[in-house]
A protein has these predicted regions:
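Charged phosphate-binding loop/patch that engages nucleotide di/tri-phosphates or the phosphate backbone
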Residues: 130-147
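Conserved N-terminal beta-strand and adjoining loop/helix that marks the start
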Residues: 2-28, 48, 79
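Active-site-adjacent beta-strand/loop module that shapes the phosphate/pyrophosphate-binding cleft
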Residues: 70, 80-104, 115, 119, ...
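A conserved beta-turn-beta hairpin within the catalytic core of GNAT-like acetyltransferases
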Residues: 36-41
Length: 147
């Protein structure tokens, strides 16, 4: 096998901004749609950075597109590097709040469900692998334990 086809070949990196939208001691989890990778698994809403975008800008744009609401990103609470079979994910999770009067909406094709999750929900939901890695940090931010 030559180097070009080596199993150790570098994976392309995909940069993603995800939102831990918090309200009243809970955080928003979104269920992925049918027909997409990890269908019906839960995730933190967000998406890929566009050229020239910061993680904060991408987070605001993606939440507007996916949930039709406006958020205020406060800060990055965790970064995760995760290898999938066809790409390397570099994800930053931003602690966010909803702007006053805003509420997330289901938009056809984006998600099949939304839940304001507490610690019990967080541990029982079927999470996308990279997003699962963020759960302890989010619970810590909310002052909750993973028990």
């Amino acid at each position: 096998m030559d180097a070009q086809h080596s199993s150790n070949q570098a994976l392309r990196t995909v940069q993603v901004a995800a939102a831990a939208i918090v309200s009243e001691g809970r955080f928003l989890a979104a269920r992925r749609p049918l027909g997409k990778r990890f269908a019906l698994m839960w995730e933190f809403p967000g998406g890929k950075l566009e050229p020239g975008e910061s993680f904060e800008q991408a987070c605001v744009r993606e939440i507007e597109e996916e949930l039709d609401c406006a958020i205020v990103p406060e800060r990055v609470i965790e970064s995760v590097e995760h290898d999938y079979d066809t790409f390397h994910l570099s994800m930053k999770l931003l602690l966010c709040t909803l702007m006053e009067g805003e509420r997330p909406c289901l938009i056809q094709g984006e998600h099949t469900g939304l839940i304001w999750a507490d610690a019990k929900d967080a541990m029982s939901l079927d999470w996308v692998p990279a997003d699962r890695e963020h759960i302890p940090a989010v619970l810590k931010e909310l002052g909750l334990s993973a028990s």
